[in-house]
Structures are given as structure tokens and as C-alpha cells.
From Swiss-Prot:
Residue segments, region Disordered: 460-489, 557-612
Gene from which the chain derives: kex1
Residues annotated as signal peptide: 1-19
GO cellular component: a single term: membrane
BP GO annotations: apoptotic process; proteolysis
Primary enzyme class: hydrolase
Family: Belongs to the peptidase S10 family.
Cytoplasmic side: 525-612
Full protein name: Pheromone-processing carboxypeptidase kex1
Biological source species: Aspergillus niger (strain ATCC MYA-4892 / CBS 513.88 / FGSC A1513)
UniProt biased composition (Polar residues): 472-485, 597-612
Bias type Basic and acidic residues, positions: 571-585
GO MF annotation, one: serine-type carboxypeptidase activity
Localization (cell): Golgi apparatus, trans-Golgi network membrane
EC assignment: 3.4.16.6
Lineage: Eukaryota, Fungi, Dikarya, Ascomycota, Pezizomycotina
Length: 612
């Protein structure tokens, strides 16, 4: 009877069988990882569309340190249809590939003071999958599925549900991110007064974003003139201006379109005009050139290592990839990009005013060497946008917020500008993928935006200044961006270690002296009683001599007791290389996490160009 009832329940409730716990997503090892303790991470698929076999893949890293608050940063790449593994392994993640087999640490990783969550979306992107007849078409469809993903992710990892949440990304993610933010705010309104927790969405970061097609399409020629790519007034320029006038007319009649073919022709023609010796301009980094059939699609060069690494069988297994997905990882999915062509969803620029007026902080940043999502277009969309009682960066009618010079480790890094919850950062000498070129500067920008305060944990600050002023929150903590600060930390650790060794040696020497004196006293008494005494170093005693015991302590034969050390000095020791396994005060070990999760489970029974 009992077995029949159990079988019936399992049949009626397949979720009892299929429900996963966090332990099922734990990454036990990562091929090619640097020596030492592995960073704490989870990865795998979460189902978001059961009817169409829709699953989103995520890769999550726990923060290495906690400053003044718990934070989670969600990172999305663009496309549409380009994998966020670009961000994980080439931009803001803790690892970079030295070759297709070896990982190295990224000095500017964003996981220093925030949990990092990379998501391949929409379905069909990267390691995510769905039935081939069920790719998404609209931005509101995408955001709805992302909410389903987050609901399940927070069920699996409830310890992060109260974190300050930031959503970051680049390029076509400039469409995704505002839509997801709006969906989160609507979800929070719907759960008010219920026992369900609201999500503490604090800010958005969009780099070289495809946000406003009107301004971005119309920025191609002005940017090309500004950078000397095309000579203004030339025959070539006039030919391109004809195409741009057609684009402008289409924009006026199709204001709610995210993508327009007539405007894409401007970029295609511009790239064709730059061909020399079978090489054309790299549209993602104008300092570089590429083959005429690619014009930047072969960039970054790290892709040569990322693709074979993510297609390795041992890596796929380590990341808990569904073995039924046999297509293998590709950076950008043409099928997803072709299907995702919003006709009903207005461009995300129309959502920004409402998000800013709700109190949400938004940061738009632009690498100055990107053509396809260049800073001229971003600056123009800001100038034209109205929010919070003003237009653009107005502080009062006719008065604009000043631009502040940003320097990093003594070198000009860019400019900052802020008004009414919106921050703009122009970053010098950076491409379409700012963190790829300048990881440490990008981390400094993130820490400023999140108001990271490391005063409670110490560490040496990065030399980062706004108009020459260094603010406390620009420090980068125990895993410093500054090379000089890192060397100082190593010297401090070495000095503290030597002090500890010296103290332990002094303590042992004192024990030896006391032992010798006591032994001598007994020998003296023995000689007085027995005249046949043979001496201290008799061969029968050689195996347990005090000197050998002392030698054993020096060579690790036995540990010096804790009382021999100054515990305060030892507690102060910290190095990212030596203590990378420590993440938070009072945190349980990975094994404890897994066993607890098993216990809890038992108790509960884009277009023609990729905007990557």
C-alpha cells in the first residue's frame, strides 16, 4: 500500500523527482584553473519554458570579499544571441584564458566585492537551449522568461535574495537590461503585502549600449569624421551622406523599431570604404583591422582559445551542462539573432526616463574606440532624453552638469558626468568591450558606482582620482588593482611571517634551555648518588635528543603549538593567492554547504552585425 501511494505521488508530482538543489549546480573542479583552492562557483541550466524545452544556462561566482554590503551583479552580453561567456572569460569574470587549456586570474575581476552571475539569454544562446521552433521574438517575452529564471535561481540560492542587485552588460544588452529592470519593478509591485520577498534592484550598468537606434544609427558618420576615418566633404563622404539621409527618413517613419535594414546599409558601406590590401576597419575597435569578410567579427583574439575551451568535454561536464545538448558552444547564434527582431517592443531608450524617475541609478559607459555603438550616439541620446524635470545633463535650465576628469594610476582614464540618477563615463583607449581592454579601470568604475566602502576590511587603494581628488570609496581592497599596492601587501605578509617564525623560534629555544637546565639538575643529583653516570649523549638516548626534537619542529615534523605565536599577527595575514577560498565571515565550507543542501532537499521531499 505504501509503495503504491509513493508511486502515485511521484507520478502526479514529477517536480518531486526533478527538483534540484544548489548542490546539484556546485562546480567541484574546473579544468585548467590556477593552482590553489578553486573559487566557489555554481553552474548549470534552469528551465524557463517547460512546454518548449527552454532552459537558460548560468555561471555564478561567489564574491571573494564583502565590503559594507552584500551585492550581486548580473552580467549579460548582447547580439542578440551572443553568449555571456564572453563576459565570463574575456571581460569581467575572475579567469582569462592563457591558451585553450590554461586559465589565469583576471586582475580586474568584478567578483571582488560582488557575486557574479553570468546568464546565456535569450533561450538558444550559448549553452542555453530551446526547441528550434520556439526562439523568442520580442523584448517583453525575453524579460518575462528572465523573471522565471530569477525566481528559480533565488529559490536555489536564497542567501542572495536580499542582496543589492545590479544588472550590467554591453551592446545589445542595452535593450535587454532596461526591459528586465522594468519587469523586476513590476514583479516587486505584485508581491507587495505578500510573504514573497522583493528584489532590491539598485542599479544598471550599460557599456557601449545599443539603446536608442535613432541616435546610434545617425552617429556613424559624425564619429567617422571625428576620428578621421572618413574625410568630411570628400566624394566618399557624400556617397555615405546619401545613404544616411535615407536612414533618417526611415527612422522618422519607424520610430519604434529597434533595427532597420536601410540604416544598416550605412555601416556596411562605411566599412567597404575602408578596405585596403584586403583588410577593413574593425568596427568594434578602430585601432585594428580585420579581413574584408569580417571587419571585426574575428575579434577579440581571445576567442581562438575560448571556443575550444568551452567545447571540451571535461569543461562541459564540470559546468554541469545538460549532456543532451550536443550542438556545442558557439559565441553568437545566428538562429537566435534572426528570430529576435522586435516588431512590437519599442526601443529601451523609452524605458530609461521611468526607471530613472523611480530612483534607480543608471550608468552608461563608452569606450572611445568603438564604432558600431560609439560614444557620440550615447551622448546624443542623453542630450535628447527628458527625465526628472530636466533635459539631458541639465542641473537647471540652460546649465549643464560639468564633466570631471578621471585619472587612474597617474594616467588620464576618461571623464565622468552625473545628473539626476544618471552617470555617464567616457573611457579613453577602450573598444566596444571596455573590460576586455581595461579590466582594472572597469572594476574601479564598478566600485565607485556601487559605493563600495572597504574601510572595514583594509587593503591598499588604487590610485584613482576624479578632478585630482581621491575619494575613500575608490579603494579596491584586499585584492588591489594597483601593482604597487599588491607588492606592498606581499612584503607586509613576508615581514609578518618572519616575525611569527622568530617568535616561535625564541619560544622553542626557551623550552630547550629550561629542559637542559632541568636535565642538568637531575644529572648532578644522579652523579652524587651514582658514580657510574655515562653522560648526556649516550647512544641509547640519541633517538630522542632535545636537538632532534628541535630539528623536527623546524622541518615540520611536529607543529609548534598555537601558544608559541602571536595570534593577532597571524589573523592579520591575508593574501588572495594564499587564502582565495575565504569569501565571507562565518561562512561554512563547501562540503558543509553541499551536505546541508542535500539535507534540505530531503526534508522538503541581432541584425547584420553582432552587438555582442
Amino acid at each position: 500500500m505504501a509503495s503504491w501511494l509513493l508511486s502515485t505521488l511521484l507520478f502526479l508530482s514529477p517536480s518531486l523527482v526533478s527538483a534540484k538543489s544548489a548542490a546539484d549546480y556546485y562546480v567541484h573542479s574546473l579544468p585548467g584553473a590556477p593552482e590553489g583552492p578553486l573559487l566557489k562557483m555554481h553552474a548549470g541550466h534552469i528551465e524557463v519554458d517547460p512546454q518548449n524545452n527552454g532552459n537558460l544556462f548560468f555561471w555564478h561566482y561567489q564574491n571573494r570579499h564583502i565590503a559594507n554590503r552584500q551585492r550581486t551583479v548580473i552580467w549579460l552580453n548582447g547580439g542578440p544571441g551572443c553568449s555571456s561567456m564572453d563576459g565570463a572569460l574575456m571581460e569581467v569574470g575572475p579567469y582569462r584564458l592563457k591558451d585553450n587549456e590554461t586559465l589565469t586570474y583576471n586582475e580586474g575581476s568584478w567578483d571582488e566585492f560582488a557575486n557574479l552571475l553570468f546568464v546565456d539569454q535569450p533561450v538558444g544562446t550559448g549553452f542555453s537551449y530551446v526547441n528550434t521552433d520556439s526562439y523568442l521574438h520580442e523584448l517583453d517575452e525575453m524579460s518575462a522568461q528572465f523573471i522565471v529564471f530569477l525566481e528559480e535561481w533565488f529559490r536555489l540560492f536564497p542567501e542572495y535574495e536580499r542582496d543589492d542587485i545590479y544588472i550590467a552588460g554591453e551592446s545589445y544588452a542595452g535593450q535587454h537590461i532596461p526591459y528586465i529592470a522594468k519587469a523586476i519593478q513590476e514583479r516587486n509591485k505584485n508581491v507587495q503585502g505578500k510573504t514573497i520577498a522583493s528584489w532590491n534592484l539598485k542599479g544598471l550598468l550599460i557599456g557601449n549600449g545599443w539603446i536608442s537606434p535613432n541616435e546610434q544609427y545617425m552617429s556613424y558618420l559624425p564619429y567617422a569624421y571625428e576620428e578621421g576615418l572618413i574625410k568630411e566633404g570628400s566624394r566618399t563622404a557624400k556617397e555615405l551622406e546619401v545613404l544616411q539621409s535615407v536612414c533618417k527618413s526611415r527612422l522618422e517613419t519607424g520610430k519604434n523599431k529597434v533595427h532597420l535594414n536601410d540604416c544598416e546599409k550605412v555601416m556596411n558601406a562605411l566599412l567597404d570604404k575602408t578596405v585596403e590590401d584586403n583588410k577593413c576597419l574593425n568596427m568594434y575597435d578602430i585601432r585594428l583591422r580585420d579581413t574584408t569578410d569580417a571587419c571585426g567579427m574575428n575579434w577579440p583574439t581571445d576567442l581562438e582559445d575560448v571556443k575550444p575551451y568551452l567545447q571540451r568535454e571535461d569543461v562541459v561536464k564540470a559546468l554541469n551542462i545538460n549532456p543532451e545538448k550536443k550542438s556545442g558552444w558557439v559565441e553568437c547564434s545566428g538562429a537566435v539573432s534572426s528570430a529576435f527582431n522586435p516588431q512590437k517592443s519599442p526601443p529601451s531608450v523609452q524605458l530609461l526616463p521611468g526607471l530613472l524617475e523611480s530612483g534607480l541609478q543608471i550608468l552608461l559607459f563608452s569606450g572611445d574606440k568603438d564604432l558600431i555603438c560609439n560614444h557620440v550616439g550615447t551622448e546624443q541620446l542623453i542630450n535628447n532624453m527628458k527625465w526628472n524635470g530636466g533635459t539631458g545633463f541639465e542641473t537647471s535650465p540652460g546649465v549643464w552638469a560639468p564633466r570631471h576628469d578621471w585619472s587612474f594610476e597617474g594616467e588620464p582614464a576618461g571623464i565622468y558626468q552625473y545628473a539626476r540618477n544618471l552617470t555617464y563615463v567616457l573611457i579613453y583607449n577602450a573598444s566596444h568591450m571596455v573590460p576586455y581592454d581595461l579590466p582594472r579601470q572597469s572594476r574601479d568604475m564598478l566600485d565607485r558606482f556601487m559605493n563600495v566602502d572597504i574601510a572595514s576590511i583594509g587593503g591598499s587603494p588604487a590610485d584613482s582620482r576624479i578632478d585630482g581628488e581621491k575619494l575613500p570609496q575608490t579603494s579596491v581592497g584586499g585584492h588591489p588593482n594597483s601593482t604597487a599596492a599588491e607588492e606592498q601587501e606581499k612584503e607586509r605578509i613576508k615581514e609578518t611571517e618572519w616575525k611569527a617564525y622568530a617568535k616561535s623560534g625564541e619560544a622553542v629555544l626557551l623550552v630547550v634551555i629550561i629542559g637542559v637546565l632541568v636535565w642538568g639538575f637531575f644529572i648532578w643529583r644522579s652523579r652524587r648518588r651514582h658514580q657510574g653516570y655515562r653522560g648526556v649523549w649516550h647512544k641509547d638516548m640519541s633517538g630522542s635528543s632535545v636537538l632532534e626534537r628541535f630539528h623536527n619542529k623546524r622541518t615540520g615534523g611536529a607543529d609548534v603549538e598555537a601558544g608559541d605565536f602571536d595570534e593577532a599577527e597571524l589573523d592579520d595575514l591575508h593574501s588572495p593567492d594564499l587564502e582565495r577560498e575565504h569569501y565571507a565571515v562565518g561562512e561554512d565550507s563547501d562540503e558543509d554547504d553541499i551536505s546541508r543542501q542535500h539535507s534540505q532537499q530531503a526534508s522538503r521531499a541581432g541584425g547584420s552585425h553582432n552587438l555582442s
